Regions:
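SAM-dependent methyltransferase
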Residues: 155-228
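Class I SAM-dependent methyltransferase "Motif I" SAM/SAH-binding loop
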Residues: 56-60
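Conserved class I S-adenosyl-L-methionine
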Residues: 1-50
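Conserved beta-strand signature within the Rossmann-like core of class I S-adenosyl-L-methionine
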Residues: 148-155
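A short acidic, Gly/Pro-enriched loop at the edge of an enzyme's catalytic core
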Residues: 109-117
Length: 270
């Protein structure tokens, strides 16, 4: 089997929606169940069908899963390949779905206060490297929510006192395609509040193997820094924290004892 190595870039992973989708496929059912459990646990006046927004929706795997549950789902992503892939998979739901190109820090919606639920998982929020952009994004999410609506954000925290390099690996297969995804994170640069990230996808299909690498930086957050950020958004209240096991019964404190955190934020009522 021949192997071709692709040049590294900042977008390679996202320019290949199928392979990106395969990497995260195993999370979809767990995340869907968790969102329903979170609404039951923390929501009010949701009814059976909700209007949901997913910032940075990627390949649309969660949009599809939630649409299959009868919800109206909207999402955006800044990568046009991901948007096109998501639109194609959601065609069968017609008017109950909407996907468009946009960015986390300055996205536009048709009507403020119209969403019941917003979710942004897999640490996507850390792509915003500047504090002002993180604040702007949270404010836009708050404005998009109705009073009492929920916003769930999942991200990795950084403990600057215990900050080694990290490595994760995923393997998945679909329709004769095998994807091995490996992700490395370097120790955080504390002053800059960034960590260098590298993902290598080894893709095997039709007797050939190729490698695609993606390089980027994440913004880092300690628990204290995340609390400070949330304190700037007066319209959102932190009601609970969970982790990437997606168990509604397993709550976490917002501290540096655990790296994976899911924030459950509620839009305050006036």
């Amino acid at each position: 089997m021949s192997t071709a190595v692709a040049l590294s870039s900042s977008t390679a992973w996202y320019d290949s929606p199928l392979y990106y989708d395969m990497v995260y496929e195993d999370y979809t059912k767990r995340e869907t169940r968790f969102l329903h459990a979170a609404v039951k646990e923390y929501g009010k006046d949701f009814g059976e069908s909700w209007k949901i927004l997913e910032p940075a929706c990627g390949s649309g795997r969660l949009l599809e899963s939630l649409a299959e549950c009868g919800h109206t789902v909207h999402g955006f992503d800044r990568n046009r390949n991901q948007v096109a892939y998501a639109k194609k998979r959601l065609k069968k739901f017609s008017s109950k779905t909407k996907v468009w190109e946009d960015s986390l820090q300055d996205f536009k919606i048709t009507k403020s206060g119209s969403y019941d639920l917003i979710h942004c998982f897999v640490t996507t929020f850390k792509y915003l490297l500047k504090e002002k952009d993180a604040v702007a994004s949270l404010r836009l999410m708050s404005e998009a929510l109705r009073p009492g609506g929920l916003c769930l954000i999942g991200l990795h925290l950084t403990n600057y006192k215990d900050n080694p390099a990290d490595y994760e690996k995923w393997v998945n297969r679909r329709d004769g395609v095998k994807v091995v995804s490996e992700t490395w994170s370097e120790p955080a640069k504390i002053k800059q509040r960034t960590e260098a990230m590298r993902t290598r996808m080894t893709i095997s299909e039709k007797g050939k193997t190729r490698v695609e690498e993606t390089l980027w930086d994440f913004r880092t957050y300690s628990a204290k820094e995340l609390k400070s950020l949330l304190g700037k958004i007066k319209t959102l209240e932190l009601v609970a924290c969970h982790d990437f096991h997606y168990s509604i019964r397993q709550k976490r404190k917002l501290n540096d004892a655990y790296t994976d955190i899911i924030l459950v934020l509620k839009k305050k009522t006036k």
